[in-house]
Amino acid sequence: MAKTATPGACASDPGSGPLPENYEMALAELEALVARMEGGTLSLEDSLAAYRRGAALVAFCQQQLEKAEQQVRVLDGASLKPLSAGTAAADGEDDDL
């Protein structure tokens, strides 16, 4: 029986693997990955693997943020209102205290 690979994962890709346990761990890994990529020392193959991993991490982070937003909506009774410029300015006045 033939083995099937996990979509988006490649056995020869060291950057592929299970997603982190939570948003904070994913964000930390993504920041480290970006720093490595910005360093300019990765080979083309490693850069592509890093890009794929980064894309997976970004998707995971977006999913986690959407889940958190949904939970806030439930807790807040779906009464969230868009933040207006006037509200943001009024809230920012206390920053100098």
Swiss-Prot record:
The keyword Cytoplasm applies. Its main location: cytoplasm. It catalyses: Exonucleolytic cleavage in either 5'- to 3'- or 3'- to 5'-direction to yield nucleoside 5'-phosphates. It comes from the Bacteria. It is found in: Cytoplasm. The keyword Hydrolase applies. Residues 1-21 are annotated as: Disordered. Belongs to the XseB family. HAMAP family: Exonuc_7_S (MF_00337). Bidirectionally degrades single-stranded DNA into large acid-insoluble oligonucleotides, which are then degraded further into small acid-soluble oligonucleotides. This is Exodeoxyribonuclease 7 small subunit. It comes from Burkholderia mallei (strain ATCC 23344).
